Amino acid sequence: VAMTGHDLFPWLSTAVPLMGALAGRIFCRDPHQLKTSCLLWSVLSLIPIAASDVAMPEGPLLLYLLPIAAAISLLGQPVHRDHRLSWLMTLVCLGLGIGVIVHQGVFAHLFLLALLATTISLLVHHHTTLWPISWWGIGLFGLAGVSVIMTAFTDPPISSSAAFLTCVVLIPLLPFHTGYLTALTRLPGNLPSFAAVLLPSVGLHFMVGMLPTIPITITGLVSLFALAGALYGAVKALAQTRVRLMLSYGSLSFFSVLWWFAAMSHM
């Protein structure tokens, strides 16, 4: 069966950043050219997205937001040899994130698993004395990966509960917020600033389809945890002296308000 344009563009949207990461290895010896290449590929990934016309319940904004966020995070990082891996991994994560949003069913789950596995690998291999390894945060991303598998191979209500667990890790909700905080504080280079947009965007895509299947009793608990998370995140953000932690807890407070709004709308 011939692949139509409607089928081709989602795959092309996913492939462009991944091809950019592969092509970028040519410039690994020259950090300036590598950064320029990664920037160009990030911008180029907007073209197939604009042409794909993929219909999504949450609208097309998330798809356009991801390449723009990737490009901005790359622009904000100074040229240095130590940042080469993070530039290439920005394109890899961009391709996987787009793949989660533009595809459906098993392909979306596979791309999300790959994104979670990539995040876990980066967190395991990149940590410093200032930011020691956080096994609790890594474990939460592992839990999200197991939940993705359960979502793909089980039926409701188990699949709905598994999808909910995935969402509360990607869009931080107390007490599952440590994974998001770990990504924003431990990932190398420019990846924390990109992950701050990528993870909630992917989670929001899943939340739109998941929330209507969650029982009212669960959404009531979500609203309570969301209010607690908003207060906790705000207080913790005010008490921080390190910028990454301040932004991380500020994000927790913001996304807790989003969870509260989503839960109350469902109720």
In which residue ranges do the predicted regions lie?
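Hydrophobic/aromatic residues in alpha-helical transmembrane segments
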Residues: M19, L96, V148-T151, F176, ...
